[in-house]
Curated annotation (Swiss-Prot):
One of its GO terms (molecular function) is electron transfer activity. SUPFAM superfamilies: alpha-helical ferredoxin (SSF46548), Nqo1 FMN-binding domain-like (SSF142019). This is Ion-translocating oxidoreductase complex subunit C. Its EC number is 7.-.-.-. Residues 369-397, 407-436 form the 4Fe-4S ferredoxin-type domain. The complex is composed of six subunits: RsxA, RsxB, RsxC, RsxD, RsxE and RsxG. Disulfide bonds: none annotated. The gene is rsxC.
Length: 741
């Protein structure tokens, strides 16, 4: 009797709240064995077929690949994908994938060569001699993921379980209508499934292993019992048929009576669950050395002539599978990927088969009934009664429709498994699952944005803290430098202090006054003379620099002198026409005359020291002399006609100006004497030029005689100009005689 009670407690099962019993419709496809599908010509392999980030590409366009060759690298939680057959990579581009919105994801497109050649396979038949880490790494690198629908990387799941797993559950319930992929796999490959379960048990080392299967699969139950006849470590549990008993939380509660905590995982209560198809893929990866390149897919529905279960290569277009099964589409034909309750309608049929594709349902127009129009909620609570997660779907519906994300989160919308039981029983035909999916996606987007904002804030605060630390360190360095000067700074400070002390000592010496003696100012006089000498030396150096930069040009000097004379004449005329009350200060005039003499001496020195860069042309000099004589005669006539008797010429100024003119004439003669005559003057040309100059002078005199005297000529300047003209004429005549000789 005690053994009976122990056996009863050992095989006890629990029941969850809610659930429904829809028509199963499994007999359409579970009566025929698994079969192979001819290879498609073109395969589209999305890089992301699992939960997590996509892997890193390791192939490029034009590469030849073999079946089982990795297309991406799996690092961390990134799961690699493998080539489903041998062929050539023709493109790596975004392509629509198996998603309700057919979103485009980066995919590798391969053209098959028809040979279907494998890569070299290295199986581990003695897997028990391998370490736990080696087995997990092999499972991960061979691309094994959860094939029950979630697509979570199996290697990551096993690694996270660690040594705290007490119960390993194999999910063989397959509760959704129409789907028979796991049922047929257990009927045809029961031994391989059990071998995969043993590999998982070797990795996790659990206390018990449970296989949960619904009682509507008698053939699969018989095959498993036959394989497990001599095994006592694996227990087969047959449970009543009820939707959704295949859910992870629901099956865990049915077999163990434990509930997964809100927001937690099954590993928190010592339970880890794997699918039947996943166990089979683990066996092929470890023992056979074959990455996951195909899976069992159910082809069913009244629009398919030959329904059944097939081995479908990953990346095969859906259209290719349906056409092989005798697909007869109607005018408004729909194709559902997954079951009728949790699946989604495909926008078109060019999407590929992926790791989580377990069923392709092509119903006829009458099979699922006419679509009903959505109506208002009547608050009947039928959805709450059917919910297996003990939620309030009607409240979640209102919160989702009203964009009340906080209230939806408070009412545990994250615990919804999207089984569709609430929508199945709703008398108002409200697609509750669609509302819940959209609401969860919006909440996830909001949380992701908040996470990015928090990370950005953390980065900003870290940067501010770093800048503050750098600023504090910089200030500390400055303070240290101010408190502790460098060695050379110490020497300079000491020298300055010594000078100050010396001056103070000198200042404190008493001044002794002796009668009859003069004070000794020799030191002060010597210092003053030294400063003057230093100033003169600096001025001389500056003068030499200016002389080197500027070389005197005789022609430019003559032009500048003429401009100066013109400006002087204009100034004198203005002074002569000015009102008599403006008197000239003799002292200022004397100062200006002295400044002018100094400038003249400086200019003469520059011209004397400058190297003559250009030679004076004698012909030009002769012409200039003739022009000067003409101008002199013109000035004399103007002076005689227009000079006012009241203006008297100062003899001293005239003498000074005459001396300046003589000095300029001597300087010009020296330049001409030092200049090497490059060209000989033709006497005939010189005579012609002189005649032309005299003609121009006479013409100018006539014009001046006829013109009304508008301007008053300064007699002193006229005298100076006449003297200069006579000197230039005499010099030109001498030069002409020298050239003729």
């Amino acid at each position: 009797m005690l053994k009976l009670f122990s056996a009863f407690r050992k095989n006890k099962i629990w029941d969850f709240n809610g659930g429904i019993h829809p028509p199963e419709m499994k007999t359409q496809s579970n009566g025929t064995p698994l079969r192979q599908v001819p290879l498609a010509q073109r395969f589209v392999i999305p890089l992301k077929q699992h939960i997590g980030a996509e892997g890193e590409l390791c192939v490029s366009v034009g590469d030849k690949v073999l079946r089982g060759q990795p297309l991406t690298r799996g690092r961390g939680k990134m799961l690699p994908v493998h080539a489903p057959t041998s062929g050539t990579v023709t493109a790596i581009a975004p392509h629509s994938t198996s998603h309700p919105s057919a979103l485009a994801e980066l995919s590798v497109i391969i053209d098959a060569d028809g040979e279907d050649c494998w890569i070299p396979r290295d199986g581990w038949a003695d897997y028990r001699s391998r370490s736990r880490e080696e087995l997990i790494e092999r499972i991960h690198q061979f691309g094994v993921a959860g094939l029950g629908g979630a697509g979570f990387p199996t290697g990551v799941k096993l690694q996270g379980g660690g040594d705290k797993i007490e119960t390993l559950i194999i999910n063989a319930a397959e509760c959704e209508p129409y789907i028979t992929a796991d049922d047929r796999l257990m009927q045809d490959c029961a031994a391989q499934v059990v071998e995969g379960i043993r590999i998982l048990a070797h990795i996790l080392q659990p206390r018990e292993i449970l296989i949960g299967i619904e009682d509507n699969k008698p053939q699969a139950i018989s095959m498993l019992r036959a394989v497990l006849a001599d095994s006592h470590d694996i227990s087969l549990r047959v449970i009543p048929t009820k939707y959704p008993s295949g859910g992870a939380k629901q099956l865990t509660y049915i077999l163990t009576g434990k509930q997964v905590p809100h927001g937690g995982r099954s590993s928190d209560i010592g339970v880890l669950m794997q699918n039947v198809g996943t166990a089979y893929a683990v066996k092929r990866a470890v023992i056979d050395g074959e990455p996951i390149t195909e899976r069992v897919v159910t082809l069913t529905g009244e629009a398919i002539a030959r329904p059944g279960n097939v081995w479908a290569r990953l990346g095969t277009p859906v259209r290719h599978l349906l056409n092989d099964a005798g697909f007869c589409p109607s005018a408004d034909q729909m194709v559902i990927m997954g079951g009728p309750l949790m699946g989604f309608t495909l926008p078109w049929l060019d999407v590929p088969v992926v790791k989580i594709t377990n069923c392709l349902l092509a119903p006829s127009a009458n099979e699922l009934g006419e679509p009903q129009e959505e109506q208002s909620c009547i608050r009947c609570s039928a959805c709450a009664d059917a919910c297996p997660a003990d939620l309030l779907p009607q409240q979640l519906y209102w919160f989702s429709k009203g964009q009340q994300h906080d209230k939806a989160t408070t009412h545990n919308i994250a615990d919804c498994i999207e089984c569709g039981a609430c929508a199945w029983v709703c008398p108002s035909n409200i697609p509750l699952v669609q509302y819940f999916r959209q609401e969860k996606a919006e909440i996830a987007a909001i949380r992701q944005e908040e996470k990015r904002a928090a990370e950005a804030k953390a980065r900003f605060e870290a940067r501010q803290a770093r800048l503050e630390r750098e600023k504090a360190a910089r200030l500390e360095r400055h303070k240290s430098a101010a408190v502790q000067p460098a060695a050379k700074d110490k020497d300079a400070i000491a020298a300055a202090l010594a000078r100050v002390k010396e001056k103070q000592a000198q200042a404190t010496q008493p001044i002794v006054i002796k009668a009859g003696e003069r004070p000794d100012n020799s030191a002060i006089i010597a210092a003053r003379e030294a400063r003057k000498a230093q100033a003169r030396a600096k001025q001389a150096e500056l003068q030499q620099t200016n002389d080197a930069a500027t070389v005197a040009d005789p022609r430019k000097t003559a032009v500048e002198a003429a401009i100066a004379r013109a400006k002087a004449r204009k100034l004198e005329q203005q002074q002569a026409n000015a009102e008599p009350e403006q008197q000239v200060d003799p002292r200022k005039a004397a100062v200006e005359a002295a400044i002018a003499r100094a400038k003249a001496r400086k200019l003469e020195q520059q011209q004397a020291n400058a190297e003559p860069e250009e030679q004076i042309d004698p012909r030009k000099a002769a012409v200039e002399a003739a022009i000067a004589r003409a101008k002199a005669r013109k000035l004399e006539q103007q002076q005689q006609a227009n000079a006012e008797p009241e203006e008297q010429v100062d003899p001293r100024k005239a003498a000074v100006e005459a001396a300046i003119a003589r000095a300029k004439a001597r300087k010009l003669e020296q330049q001409q004497a030092n200049a090497e005559p490059e060209e000989q003057i033709d006497p005939r040309k010189a005579a012609v030029e002189a005649a032309i100059a005299r003609a121009k002078a006479r013409k100018l005199e006539q014009q001046q005689a006829n013109a009304e005297p508008e301007e008053q000529i300064d007699p002193r300047k006229a005298a100076v100009a006449a003297a200069i003209a006579r000197v230039q004429a005499k010099k030109a005549a001498q030069q002409k005689v020298v050239n003729e000789d």
